[in-house]
């Protein structure tokens, strides 16, 4: 059973206001000029965080990456970047960007994110463009790195390059401010718009929730069911080129039985190379026997070619997210059956 993170977070009352965000940022930077680098281009995921951060600083310098953000939301196309002849690791000002690329809008939302983020960044906001995280240090030594999956490496790069203070989104609201919600592990990462002045944070205490839910199923139904919380799936849209995973992880909490990777043989490979001379029931029985006798670790073995094992929680969470959608299906949890069965069962 996979439960969507939103249900858990809402049940926990894990919310924070923009003023809570501003207070935490102000406490960390003391009204200094702050650089905000590598944010994703998303009204749902980042616009309100930007507003809150802007309220807590004296001046904000926002550094955007080209041609897209970390998860594939494009400011411009790859072709436009190539044709421009610029080095994306150099610094491009807002004026230079508009001169080269006009006023591009997001392919799906129709939003001009440069204009939107400039308006949300407050009166004293500047926007630059560079794929080099350390470019921001020419403007300020105090930085919020807003990237998600590369945040630890980015922070290390900035500190080695001379930054005085670097704070990731996971460091903001990792403790309660003014009795706000918080997430000790992920801070603002995984948050969503709730209202115009409030965000819903990623749920906390998630491992315990999964274990408690499993106990409840056992108590009420007498069955041991693996349980997990899921947010964004880890799949990438082949048309829009957007990677769905804007959360810090696919599954922040799960029971012990969901730890690890699949260990499978490739039926097509075995059918062609091992039992190709057999037909009908003989072929079926031979395949079943091969599956039953497979090694516990098939790494680097030909029979596992093309199976590319991924974490079970990433696979199941992606399956759940694709099933539940992101709109009005009304599916707070997903029931998955027979996932751990194979051809031999």
Segments the model singles out, each with a brief description of its role:
Residues 1, 6-345:
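Conserved mixed alpha/beta catalytic, RNA-binding, or beta-rich assembly cores of soluble enzyme
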């Amino acid at each position: 059973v996979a439960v969507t993170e939103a249900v858990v977070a809402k049940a926990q009352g894990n919310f924070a206001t923009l003023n809570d965000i501003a207070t935490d940022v102000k406490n960390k930077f003391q009204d200094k000029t702050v650089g905000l680098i590598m944010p994703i281009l998303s009204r749902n995921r980042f616009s309100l965080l930007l507003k809150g951060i802007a309220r807590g600083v004296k001046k904000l310098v926002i550094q955007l990456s080209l041609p897209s953000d970390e998860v594939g939301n494009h400011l411009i196309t790859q072709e436009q970047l190539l044709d421009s002849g610029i080095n994306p690791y150099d610094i491009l000002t807002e004026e230079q960007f508009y001169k080269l690329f006009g006023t591009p809008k997001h392919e799906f939302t129709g939003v001009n994110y440069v204009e939107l983020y400039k308006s949300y960044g407050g009166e004293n906001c500047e926007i630059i463009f560079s794929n080099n995280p350390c470019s921001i240090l020419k403007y300020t030594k105090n930085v919020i790195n807003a990237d998600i999956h590369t945040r630890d490496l980015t922070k290390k790069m900035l500190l080695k390059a001379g930054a005085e203070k670097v704070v990731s989104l996971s460091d903001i609201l990792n403790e309660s401010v003014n009795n706000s919600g918080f997430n000790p592990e992920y801070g603002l990462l995984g948050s969503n718009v709730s209202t115009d002045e409030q965000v819903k944070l990623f749920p906390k205490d998630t491992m315990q929730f999964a274990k408690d839910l499993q106990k409840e199923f056992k108590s009420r139904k007498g069955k041991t069911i693996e349980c997990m919380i899921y947010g964004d799936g880890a799949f990438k849209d082949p048309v829009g080129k957007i990677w769905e995973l804007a959360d810090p992880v696919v599954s922040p909490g799960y029971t012990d039985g969901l730890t690890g990777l699949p260990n499978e043989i490739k039926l097509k490979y075995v059918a062609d190379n091992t039992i190709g001379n057999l037909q009908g029931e003989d072929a079926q029985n031979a395949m079943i026997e091969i599956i039953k006798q497979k090694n516990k670790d098939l790494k680097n073995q030909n029979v596992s070619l093309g199976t590319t094992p991924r974490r079970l929680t990433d696979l199941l969470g992606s399956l759940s997210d694709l099933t539940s959608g992101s709109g009005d299906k009304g599916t707070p949890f997903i029931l998955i059956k027979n996932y751990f069965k194979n051809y031999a069962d």
